[in-house]
Amino acid sequence: FLKDHFTVKLEPMAKTSRRSHAKFLKMRSLFAGKIAGAPGQDAEAYALAKKHGVQVVFGETRVLMQQATLGLIASGTATLEAALIGLPHIICYRTSALTYLLAKRLARVSYIGLPNILIGKMGIQERIQKDCHEDQLAKDLNTLHDGQSYTKKGWEQKRMSDELKSILGTQKASKSVAASILENL
C-alpha cells in the first residue's frame, strides 16, 4: 500500500520535472533532473522517477533545495523547509481517493501546506488530487519563473521566507507550527 501511495504522489512530479527540464535547461536541481529521496523510502520506490530520467538523491534535501531554482514538493515539513530557504515551489499532493475523502472529512483545514497554514493565506500554490498533474504543474511553474528570471509571483514566494521566519522566531518553531495548525482545525 505505501509503495503504491508513494508512486501516485511521485508520478506527476517526475513527469513535470522531465518536461520542465527540456524548457529550462539552465535551471538547476529539479530541472537538472533530480528528486530528493524521502527518508524511509527505499530506492526501489523511486523506479518511476528513474524511468522518467530523474536522478534520486538521498540525504541531500537541503542542499538540493538551496541549489534549486524552483521546486515541486509533496506536502509536509519539506514545504516549510523550502519556504524558509526561499525556494519558490508548488505543493503537490495526490493520494488514493479513499484516503483523500477520509482526510477531507477528518481534517478541516483551509490549506495543506505548512507555509500557507502559518501565514493564513495561499502564498504557495497547492495542487491536490485531480489538479496535481503534469500539465497543471508545468503551468504553475511558469507562473513562478519565465525561463530567464523569477516572475512577480516567484519573487513573492522568495520573500515569504522572511515572513515565516518572523512568525516562527517569536516562539520555538514547533510550538508555533502546532498552535497555528490547531487554530486552523
Task: Describe the predicted segments one by one.
Residues 1-185:
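Nucleotide-activated sugar donor-binding and catalytic core shared by glycosyltransferases
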